[in-house]
Amino acid sequence: VRSRRQRQMCIRDSFGIATASDLSAAPYKVTIDEEKVIETDTLIIATGATAKYLGLDDEKKYAGMGVSACATCDGFFYRKKVVAVVGGGDTACEEAVYLAGLAKKVYLIVRKPFLRASKIMQERVMKHENIDVLFEHNAVGLFGENGVEGVHLVKRMGEPDEERYDLAIDGFFLAIGHQPNSDIFKAYLDTDETGYIITEGDSPRTKVPGVFAAGDIADPHYRQAITAAGSGCKAALEAERYLSSKCLI
């Protein structure tokens, strides 16, 4: 038998950009588009993390046409093709190794004269014959008519022996990190040094009762749709239990 409160409940969609929050006390408040304020007894934060880009105009031009920030998402489309990965950390090395199992050739473009990745990841990269590491290289542009066909590179930028050349590729993968979209919640929730929301162990619970974090906003490691969906399910179950414990449903 459903309670009167449950019968009265309905789903309300509110589309817009969350621009502020007040989690100091329940009911919690979230401001949409800097004007509309939503009050809620419980909140699931699933704002994700945005991939960092180099800032090239061509990145937007070729988005979905050869430019990607997720090798495991889009790598399949580059089977037996030539791709480039930008970055020098663990993520970049992981992406390069993954793509090496699909692509004909992988170029790892590294701005510095060394890799920042862990020793074991560096060793994994070097074991793949179809991965070429381009140290001291900067990607400064992309080109192609109907998609990415190549990248403009500068070797030893700013040095007397600076060299500029073009490299033919089919795909351009960015692996220079992600920025969690947690700014409007940082005043109330614990985050790590990069901004990911810290939850209690494997649960989606944050330090604020009734506020939960799910998906990439609380996951700096996996960042996959299926893991985000799983954590979203856990957050929904926790939110229901919280509301029930407060006799709100």
Language model feature labels by segment:
Residues 50, 55, 60-77, 176-222, ...:
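FAD-site-proximal beta/loop scaffold in flavoenzymes
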Residues 1-11:
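Single conserved hydrophobic/aromatic residue that forms the stacking wall/gate
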Residues 13-81, 157-162, 173, 197-201:
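FAD-binding core/adjacent interface of flavoenzyme oxidoreductases
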Residues 87-89:
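Glycine-rich Rossmann-fold phosphate-binding loop(s) that bind the pyrophosphate
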Residues 5, 91-143, 244-249:
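Rossmann-like dinucleotide-binding cores of NAD(P)H-dependent redox enzymes
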Residues 227-243:
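An active-site-proximal "capping" alpha-helix that borders the catalytic cofactor pocket
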